[in-house]
């Protein structure tokens, strides 16, 4: 049930009837911000009236008389300076809310399926995941869940940094210092691996001979040297195993099969170089291979911007890998849409790779490319979120601290729960709190991380919404005839303003998901779930459920509660957040 789309169709029909079809793109239908402006609002009428040179009130009256919302709207009225407010009919709302309780997927219709590649998380190998990976991982995973739920074929792509200079440095360091890397036990592996990386980076920056040796090992690795490949595989396997533990704990759907790292495209690179040369897109300059882009000119000299795709020593660059990656996703995976959740600093680099791929004919203009920029995680001083010593906070450290805080919070509430249940609840609350704190903010903005706020049971937080679900679950634990909810004789009827507002919000779940899927902005879903939880709280406060004397009223309100619980649970699930029957 997509009310917004239904109303937009009726708007288009009306504009066609009054010969203003050419102005369709000027009109928007959106949910009203306040109940006094109705349930929905049509915006943009003032733009059409200006084009037609007709007073806005006169044009709006013509439109209101033309639009067919019979049975859907109770009131349609003009609101200065140029809005049309729509108040939905309670009878129509009753009919629709009674219909969705019997439908699969909460009444959400599947849309035409597309192949959508989502590039997210993408940590570098040889390092532990840190808080900087959190937004890409969590937001990307939520969008993958939502698009899958709507019926798309989603291809998750974890484009890990498993190739390149850092491996030349590590191999050179292990060789130089005669490190027996195979002797490390499981608990030492990832921390020692990161230590080796840090030390090798110091030598790389300070010792020209070590830097040259590192570059030689990169080339040997790329050419398939057995010794280099053995070390490389061991290092990659350690990192992948460690990252998977983080993903599992975060309830992120990424698995080993979703890894499409830089190394995957290595065998394509010689062809890419040759093909770009044959198509006169790449040239040799000072023994390196370069593609010049007219669209990206050097601002000082107004010369075409050069993108190096192969170095003098024969080594390849990230740009070469990205071109091959785009080619693979379009020609092999047949992507219709490709979404990148990666660092905003990569934007220019991505645009260059896309442009080269377009010019080479690897992709068509029909493929939609989107770089969904993510803001930064800040501390209370609005500085990048780091340890007191200035180091980046490890993701495992953040998760452990969140668990401990949630555990103590539960104990302080004096819940009469056994140890196993407290642990389970602390896990659900802590992971939910961290994920929701990321997802509830507009992904394009920086935000301040605050422990007290994210673990609060009031306000727009995961614990508040999780508790709303738990409260509804507790209602159904008190009744013995849950099967009677399915009986047709018990219909939902809306006798109060609280019930009407709750029912409308329930019917808006579908259009909310469509908006989030189109824009890649899960904070809109978070806002919806918070609004739904708040409206249920008002309904619960003003409309007795189990204590009402009328059986029909009781089951009407139980059905509203049941649908609310289903949507809260599904909505949180689409954010990658679990619920609990107790709290």
From Swiss-Prot:
Keyword annotations: Aminoacyl-tRNA synthetase, ATP-binding, Cytoplasm, Ligase, Nucleotide-binding, Protein biosynthesis
CC per GO annotation: cytoplasm
Record field: catalytic activity: tRNA(Arg) + L-arginine + ATP = L-arginyl-tRNA(Arg) + AMP + diphosphate
Domain of life: Bacteria
Motif, 'HIGH' region: chain positions: 123-133
Assembly information from the UniProt record: Monomer.
HAMAP family recorded: Arg_tRNA_synth
Name the UniProt record assigns to this protein: Arginine--tRNA ligase
Species per Swiss-Prot/TrEMBL record: Blochmanniella floridana
Lineage: Bacteria, Pseudomonadati, Pseudomonadota, Gammaproteobacteria, Enterobacterales
Gene name for this UniProt entry: argS
């Amino acid at each position: 049930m997509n009310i917004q789309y239904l109303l937009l169709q009726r708007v288009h029909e009306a504009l066609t009837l009054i010969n203003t079809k050419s102005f369709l793109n000027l009109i928007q239908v959106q949910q009203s911000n306040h109940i006094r402006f109705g349930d929905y609002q049509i915006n943009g009428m003032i733009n059409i009236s200006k084009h037609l040179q007709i007073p806005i009130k006169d044009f709006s009256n013509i439109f209101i008389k033309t639009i067919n919302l019979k049975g859907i709207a109770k009131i349609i009225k003009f609101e200065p300076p140029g809005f049309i407010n729509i108040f939905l009919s309670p009878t129509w709302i009753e009919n629709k809310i009674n219909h969705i309780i019997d439908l699969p997927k909460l009444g959400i219709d599947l849309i035409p399926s597309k192949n959508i590649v989502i590039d997210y998380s993408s940590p570098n190998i040889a390092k532990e995941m840190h808080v900087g990976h959190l937004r890409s991982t969590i937001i990307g995973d939520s969008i993958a869940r939502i698009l899958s739920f709507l019926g798309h074929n989603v291809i998750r792509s974890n484009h890990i940094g498993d190739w390149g200079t850092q491996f030349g440095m590590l191999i050179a360091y292990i060789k130089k210092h005669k490190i027996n890397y195979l002797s490390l036990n499981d608990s030492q592996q990832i921390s020692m691996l990161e230590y080796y990386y840090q030390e090798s980076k110091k030598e790389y920056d300070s010792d020209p001979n070590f830097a040259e040796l590192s570059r030689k090992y990169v080339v040997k690795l790329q050419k398939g040297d057995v010794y280099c490949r053995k070390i490389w595989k061991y290092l990659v396997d350690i990192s992948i195993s460690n990252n998977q533990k983080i993903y599992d704990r975060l309830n992120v759907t990424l698995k080993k099969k979703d890894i499409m790292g830089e190394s995957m495209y290595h065998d394509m690179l010689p062809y890419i170089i040759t093909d770009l040369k044959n198509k006169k897109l790449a040239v040799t300059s000072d023994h390196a291979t370069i593609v010049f882009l007219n669209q990206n000119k050097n601002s000082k000299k107004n010369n075409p911007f050069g993108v190096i795709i192969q170095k003098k020593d024969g080594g390849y660059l990230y740009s070469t890998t990205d071109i091959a990656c785009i080619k693979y996703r379009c020609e092999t995976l047949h992507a219709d849409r490709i979404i990148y959740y990666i660092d905003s600093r990569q934007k220019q680099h991505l645009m260059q790779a896309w442009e080269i791929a377009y010019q080479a004919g690897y992709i068509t203009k029909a493929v939609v490319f989107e770089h969904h920029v993510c803001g930064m995680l800040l501390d209370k001083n609005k500085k990048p979120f780091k340890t007191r010593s200035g180091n980046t906070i490890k993701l495992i450290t953040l998760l452990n601290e969140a668990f401990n805080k949630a555990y103590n919070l539960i104990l302080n509430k004096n819940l009469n729960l056994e140890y196993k249940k407290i642990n389970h609840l602390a896990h659900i609350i802590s992971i939910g709190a961290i994920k929701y704190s990321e997802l509830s903010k507009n992904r394009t903005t920086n935000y301040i991380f605050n422990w007290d706020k994210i673990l609060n049971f009031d306000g727009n937080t995961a614990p508040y919404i999780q508790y709303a679900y738990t409260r509804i679950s507790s209602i159904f634990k008190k009744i013995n005839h849950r099967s009677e909810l399915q009986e047709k004789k018990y219909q939902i009827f809306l006798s109060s303003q609280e019930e009407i507002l709750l029912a409308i919000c329930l019917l808006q779940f579908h259009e909310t998901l469509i908006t989030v899927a189109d824009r890649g902005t899960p904070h809109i879903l978070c806002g919806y779930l918070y609004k739904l939880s708040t409206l249920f709280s008002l309904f619960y406060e003003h409309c007795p459920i189990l204590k009402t004397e009328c059986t029909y009223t009781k089951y009407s309100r139980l059905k509203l509660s049941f649908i609310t619980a289903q949507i809260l649970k599904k909505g949180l699930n689409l954010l990658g957040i679990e619920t609990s029957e107790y709290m």
